[in-house]
């Protein structure tokens, strides 16, 4: 099974890729470190391959790196998508999440950097987020290796049983002055 690691720049995709595969791909605290896709087998799950894609904010692309990600997601049709979301900035990440959900592919949301949220005295209501989105939401810390096995199990389950996200229109006509979009 093949899973695409998709998310905004600097959300921890390559750190998660390294944690999943045992690789040592270069990680940087600035956008544009990953400029092409990389793939590797998941440790302890040799039937599972993950593809680390460059950061992308939307399926409407502007940069060459974003085109690489969009084209892989749309044309290669991986068995599932692991959407990595920076838990310290969820709102910024949700635009891409909702676009990915609309594709109707098996998907799991990896809520990364939960250790930073906790260190700053914050919390995330994961169960409520999961109920609202209709997909598994797994809190992780890729840099510490926390929640990684649970994430893999959820991703495999979603792909094996073809759990596709429910299609939601998160905007009502009231949100747009009565206009339908």
What is each of the regions a protein language model found here?
Residues 1-64, 74-76, 80:
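Conserved G1/Walker A P-loop phosphate-binding module
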Residues 23, 32, 55-56, 87-91, ...:
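Conserved nucleotide-binding/hydrolysis micro-motifs of P-loop NTPases
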């Amino acid at each position: 099974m093949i899973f695409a690691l998709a998310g905004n720049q600097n959300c921890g995709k390559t750190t998660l890729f390294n944690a999943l595969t045992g690789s040592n791909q270069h990680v940087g605290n600035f956008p544009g470190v990953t400029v092409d896709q990389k793939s590797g087998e998941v440790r302890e799950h040799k039937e599972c391959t993950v593809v680390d894609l460059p950061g992308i904010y939307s399926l409407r692309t502007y940069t060459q790196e974003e085109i690489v990600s969009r084209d892989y997601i749309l044309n290669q049709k991986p068995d599932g998508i692991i959407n990595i979301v920076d838990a310290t900035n969820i709102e910024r990440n949700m635009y891409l999440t909702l676009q990915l959900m609309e594709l109707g592919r098996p998907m799991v949301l990896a809520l990364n950097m939960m250790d930073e949220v906790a260190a700053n005295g914050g919390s995330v209501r994961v169960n409520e987020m999961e109920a609202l989105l209709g997909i598994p939401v797994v809190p992780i810390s890729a840099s510490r290796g926390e929640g990684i096995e649970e994430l893999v199990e959820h991703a495999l389950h979603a792909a094996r049983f073809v759990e596709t996200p429910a299609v939601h229109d998160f905007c009502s006509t009231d949100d747009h002055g009565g206009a339908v979009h």
